[in-house]
C-alpha cells in the first residue's frame, strides 16, 4: 500500500515521540527533520528550516506516513470551518481521552478545563462557523486553550474534520422576457 502523496502545503503531525527511537542508523535527512515536525509547519517550510531539499522532505514524510508514525493535516487558519464527526460519541464517556485532551490543549500555566466544558466547546463547532466566529461565541472559555492544539487533537483522534468550501462558477443567464415585462 502506497502512502498518500505529500504536497508542499501539507502539515505533518508526529503521532509518536520519534526522538525516543532515533539511533545512528537513521537517515540523516529524517534526523534533521524531526525537530521541525511540530504540527504547525507545512512541508515547504520544514524543508527551509531543516535546510533540506523539499523532495527529500516529502519522501521522508511519506515514509513516516507509511509506518503510521505521522499523519497529514491542513494548515491551521482561523478562517477554517470544522465540524464534529459521529466518532465523538464513544469518546464522550472515556476518561482517558478526556484527560489526554485537557493536558494537550491547555496553555502553560492554566488549570485544565473539566471534560464537559471541553466537549461543550467541541459541540459548538458548526457548518458555516469559522474558528474566528467560534472563539467570539465562546468568549472567556477559550482563553485557557491553545486553539490550534484543540483542533489538532480532534483531527488526530478522528472526531473533528475540516469543512472545505469552494466557490462554484455558474454562468449567468439573462432571464427570459415574458409578456408581463413588456407591458
Regions found by a protein language model. Give the residues of each.
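Fold-level signal for large, globular catalytic cores of enzyme and receptor domains
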Residues: 16, 21-29, 79, 85
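Short amphipathic alpha-helical interaction segments
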Residues: 51-63, 140-156
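A short, conserved structural fragment
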Residues: 65-76, 155-166
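Hydrophobic packing positions characteristic
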Residues: 1-19
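Long, compositionally biased, serine/threonine/proline- and charge-rich low-complexity regions
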Residues: 1-2, 152, 164-168
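Basic amphipathic alpha-helical segments that dock to polyanions
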Residues: 46, 61-67, 134, 150-158, ...
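Short, amphipathic alpha-helical interaction segments positioned at domain boundaries
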Residues: 78-121, 168-183
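Short helix-coil junctions and helix-kink-helix linkers
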Residues: 42-54, 120-145, 183
